[in-house]
């Protein structure tokens, strides 16, 4: 019999339910978590034995959204879900980051977490629900895991923090921050903000961590009721004698190697030391495991770098703890792009471009929470040559998607509103060199490229990556970390923002015991670094260019009567298609009668505006126009009088005497003066040549457009 075990609790404004024992009973653990009708089913499977020779922890996190959760059928050709979307990839990373550091060192058994969204309330984002589910499933499984963790989203509305805001509340919020952590410590922060202060951001992290304790308590209660026995897993015993022998051979040499400031040179020397040490030891004893020797050498490397930092000695490249590497900033480096910049910080370099397009270029995202249009695109590319390696080149990997999203968050707060700058903007960051913090170099490069393109951003933004080395109560916060310092440190802390405040904050903490005070020190040190970088960037370009690139489309906006939209579009889009072909422009019409004409040539745009104004001009009864005969029929002739409008001249209105045959008086294409006699309720126009010729006033051309009148 199915015997579900259920726990229900209040979490802010939402009710959360944890249920286990009902489904997927062959998995190591499975939990259905729901928060106000958004439900995510999370399973965990762990292998009891590690693969022979396994030297890393193979944790896989899959997050998948099912369209049936929102009562929809997939729109793809095959009508079923395909590969993970960008959003799904980002949420998989969000689940992975806080749980990965909680598995014990030396644990290399394969573990897979699968989170499936099975029901969705459009007001409740499934990401927090999935994170809670992963934490609960791992805690129930008996797999060695030092959790559970809690997860919370924090908003900032009317100067108040809001726990797990709804989608509608998020639209009003100046902050969207996700924080995850254990009972004692924060492990991960991911956020975007509208230029909030360091104190406001830190307050949000602390608030979210305090509020999520109720989740941890309830998962612990569920584990008491339904948890599986803890695995009898023990780490491999440490071979002290072997460790000492490896250290005697390599420690001093590695210490010297880590004084080489050039990354490639240092890596080459470290590789030589490692291979020579392993060769010496294998010659002494053939039974030794090469992988084990590699792990011992890595631990020595880590210790060398960390102990030097904690002792207050210069870092790997000779810098002090709060020094930033040399900066080189250039704009306008590519002649035909709309905006470009080359940003170099030490051995990290990004070539960033900005491209302007029309609303038609916006990306339509068919997401579970509903369809939305994105007019700001940010793409980050990390080719293998950037680290001096060979490798596959193809579609973006998880890391590239994650870094691109972080960089986008850093810039989003300063982007102009669509009504002020009606362009779709695409920023692409090509990482040409990498040694630490390429995502933050992308933020700096994007700010420069956007200003070079003439995008009126609200402020320049810059980003910096911070690191932390901590032993006991002794800790050092490092500014502008290298790749090696990232791998060997205890925290990776990325901050982007303007002079006014923070636009994006990302933290990944690998150890417990990071206090509010340490985070405060890191944030303040990051502010100093950010202001320094902004100062250097402002020397290259201190404001957006006054005009957009000559190669970018210029968007001209006019307003027409909404009742006339159908005339401009025409039957089946025939008129607007002919207009775009004739004028060489892109024309977009909104429901309120706003017409946007995009063209790289000003004359083409003027031509399009003139034609649209002709089409939408009101026909005045009693007025005389010059028209052109378009069709001849037995009972009269049809005459075009400009603006795509056509009227009928009845045979009785052609001349002041009886007309037997229309062709005796009129030819196709002939220009004739016509007077408008009537426009009926269906918009049909009755014309007269007879009355027009009788009238003494000269014939009028169709109304000239306002743009021309002003010239």
From Swiss-Prot:
Query: Could you tell me the keywords of this UniProt record?
Result: Cytoplasm, Magnesium, Metal-binding, Nucleotidyltransferase, RNA-binding, Transferase
Asked whether the UniProt record includes Cytoplasm among its keywords, one would answer yes
Give the binding site residues for Mg(2+): 486, 492
The segment(s) forming the KH domain are 553-612
One Pfam family, short name: PNPase
Using the UniProt annotation, give all residue ranges assigned to the region (Disordered). 689-711
Q: Which GO terms describe its biological process?
A: mRNA catabolic process; RNA processing
What SUPFAM superfamilies does UniProt report for this protein, alphabetically? Eukaryotic type KH-domain (KH-domain type I), Nucleic acid-binding proteins, Polynucleotide phosphorylase/guanosine pentaphosphate synthase (PNPase/GPSI), domain 3, Ribonuclease PH domain 2-like, Ribosomal protein S5 domain 2-like
CDD domains, per this entry? Answer: KH-I_PNPase (cd02393), RNase_PH_PNPase_1 (cd11363), RNase_PH_PNPase_2 (cd11364), S1_PNPase (cd04472)
Listed GO CC annotations: cytosol
| Class of this enzyme | transferase
Question: Where does this one sit in the cell?
Answer: Cytoplasm
Q: What is its EC number?
A: 2.7.7.8
Entries under SMART domains matching the protein: KH, S1
- Name the catalysed reactions: RNA(n+1) + phosphate = RNA(n) + a ribonucleoside 5'-diphosphate
Subunit structure, interactors included: Component of the RNA degradosome, which is a multiprotein complex involved in RNA processing and mRNA degradation.
Family the entry assigns: Belongs to the polyribonucleotide nucleotidyltransferase family.
* Function of the protein: Involved in mRNA degradation. Catalyzes the phosphorolysis of single-stranded polyribonucleotides processively in the 3'- to 5'-direction.
Protein's recorded name: Polyribonucleotide nucleotidyltransferase
Which organism is the protein's source?
Shigella boydii serotype 18 (strain CDC 3083-94 / BS512)
Task: Give the gene name.
Answer: pnp
């Amino acid at each position: 019999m199915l015997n579900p075990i259920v726990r229900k609790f209040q979490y802010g404004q939402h009710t959360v339910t944890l249920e286990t024992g009902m489904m997927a009973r062959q998995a190591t653990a499975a939990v259905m978590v729901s928060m106000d009708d958004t439900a995510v089913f999370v399973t965990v499977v762990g292998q009891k034995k590690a693969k022979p020779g396994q030297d890393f922890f193979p944790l896989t996190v899959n997050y998948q959204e099912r369209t049936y959760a929102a009562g929809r059928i997939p729109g793809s050709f095959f009508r079923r879900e395909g590969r993970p979307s960008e959003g799904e990839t980002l949420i998989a990373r969000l689940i992975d980051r806080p749980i990965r550091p909680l598995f014990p060192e030396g644990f290399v058994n394969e573990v897979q977490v699968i989170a499936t969204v099975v029901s969705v309330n459009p007001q409740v984002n499934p990401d927090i629900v999935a994170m809670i589910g992963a934490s609960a499933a791992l805690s129930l499984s008996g797999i060695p895991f030092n959790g559970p963790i809690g997860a919370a989203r924090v908003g900032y509305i009317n100067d108040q923090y809001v726990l797990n805001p709804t989608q509608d509340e998020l639209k009003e919020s100046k902050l969207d921050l996700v924080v995850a952590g254990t009972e004692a410590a924060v492990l991960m922060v991911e956020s975007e903000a509208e230029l909030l202060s360091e104190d406001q951001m830190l307050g949000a992290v602390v608030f979210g961590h305090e509020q999520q304790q109720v989740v941890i308590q309830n998962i612990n209660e569920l584990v008491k009721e339904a948890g599986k026995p803890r695995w009898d897993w023990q780490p491999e015993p440490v071979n002290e004698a072997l460790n000492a022998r490896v250290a005697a051979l390599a420690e001093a040499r590695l210490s010297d190697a880590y004084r080489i400031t050039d990354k490639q040179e240092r890596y080459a020397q470290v590789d030589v030391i490692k291979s020579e040490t392993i060769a010496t030891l294998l010659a002494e004893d053939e039974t030794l495991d090469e992988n084990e020797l590699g792990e011992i050498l890595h631990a020595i490397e880590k210790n060398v770098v960390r102990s030097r930092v904690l002792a207050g000695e210069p870092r790997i490249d000779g810098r002090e703890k709060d020094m930033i590497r040399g900066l080189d900033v250039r704009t306008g480096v590519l002649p035909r792009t709309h905006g470009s910049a080359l940003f170099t910080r030490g051995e990290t370099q990004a070539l960033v471009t900005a491209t302007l397009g029309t609303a038609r270029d916006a990306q339509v995202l068919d997401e579970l929470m509903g369809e939305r249009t994105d007019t700001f695109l940010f793409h980050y590319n990390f080719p293998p040559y950037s680290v001096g390696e060979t490798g596959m080149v193809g579609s973006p990997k998880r890391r590239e998607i994650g870094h691109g999203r972080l960089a986008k968050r850093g810039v989003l707060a300063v982007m102009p509103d669509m009504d002020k700058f009606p362009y779709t903007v695409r920023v692409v960051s090509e990482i040409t060199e990498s040694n630490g913090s390429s995502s933050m170099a992308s933020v700096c490069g994007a700010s420069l490229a956007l200003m070079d393109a003439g995008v009126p951003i609200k402020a320049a933004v810059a980003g910096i990556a911070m690191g932390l080395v901590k032993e006991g109560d002794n800790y050092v916060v490092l500014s502008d970390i290298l790749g090696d310092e990232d791998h060997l440190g205890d925290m990776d802390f990325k901050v982007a923002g303007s002079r006014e405040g923070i636009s994006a904050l990302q933290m990944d903490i690998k150890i417990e015991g990071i206090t509010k005070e340490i985070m405060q020190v890191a944030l303040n040190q990051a502010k100093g670094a950010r202001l320094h970088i902004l100062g250097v960037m402002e020397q290259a370009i201190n404001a957006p260019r006054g005009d957009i690139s000559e190669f970018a489309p210029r968007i001209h906006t006019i307003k027409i009567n909404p009742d006339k939209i159908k005339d401009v579009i025409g039957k089946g889009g025939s008129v607007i298609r002919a207009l775009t072909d004739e004028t060489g422009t892109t024309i977009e019409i909104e429901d309120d009668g706003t017409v946007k004409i995009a063209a790289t040539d000003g004359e083409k745009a003027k031509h399009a505006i003139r034609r649209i104004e002709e089409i939408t001009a009101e026909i005045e009864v009693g007025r005389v126009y010059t028209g052109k005969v378009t069709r001849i029929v037995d009972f009269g002739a049809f005459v075009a009088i400009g603006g795509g409008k056509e009227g009928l001249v009845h045979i009785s209105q052609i001349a002041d005497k009886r007309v037997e045959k229309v062709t005796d008086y009129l030819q196709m294409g002939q220009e004739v003066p016509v007077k408008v006699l009537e426009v009926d309720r269906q918009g049909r126009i009755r014309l007269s040549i007879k009355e027009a010729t009788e009238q003494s006033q000269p014939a009028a051309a169709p109304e000239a457009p306002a743009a021309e009148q002003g010239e």
